[in-house]
Each structure stands twice: as structure tokens, then as C-alpha cells.
Amino acid sequence: MSGYLVMFVADEADDGHADAMRETARGLRGAGFFDDPDLGGQRTTGTYLETDTLEDPVALELIARVSELSDALACRIEVQHREIILGHIVYGQPDEQLAAVLGFGGP
């Protein structure tokens, strides 16, 4: 069963975040971009990829690109797969919850 990897700005987002997310997804096979400036009063902007597993090389590349974006824009990104919150990327680094899901060792 296929699912979606979804990553979006968890902080207040603006046009700069939207432009950066669009560029992050561009050129990556299967990756998409979304931007809803009025969802519940807070702008929601992010990227997605249909993927069965987080081990998919394209999924890993998208996570890496979004991590770089998070660091460059000093923002927090929520990461979901199959509509389950996996954790956050904070200023380019996975939080403890996301690091465990991705199999990264502790600090």
C-alpha cells in the first residue's frame, strides 16, 4: 500500500518559504509542492512524495533537501508519512523522534 511523505513548514510561513519549498521539490522525480495561504488562518506550504517507504532513495533525497532548507531559513518542518507525524526537522536537524524513525544515532 502506497503512502505519502509530506513535509511542511510548521512555523509561520511566507512567500519566501513557499518559493524555497517549490524549488526544493522541482526536478525531483515524483515530488510535488503545495501552498495554501488561508488554511485555518495559517499558511500551509510544503512538499510531498508518494512512496511506500522512507528508504526510497527519492524520499531520502527529499528529506535531505528539506533539511537544508530548514537550516537556511531557520525554520521547523513537520514530517509525516502515511498521515502519521514522524517528528520535525528543526534548523536542519531531525528532532529526537524523527532521528529514531530515520535510524540516526543519538548525539
Residue ranges of predicted features:
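Short, extreme N-terminal segment that most often corresponds to the first beta-strand
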Residues: 1-26
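Short, flexible, solvent-exposed loop/turn segments with mixed acidic/basic and small polar residues
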Residues: 1-4, 34-42
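Charged interaction segments
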Residues: 24-32, 41-107
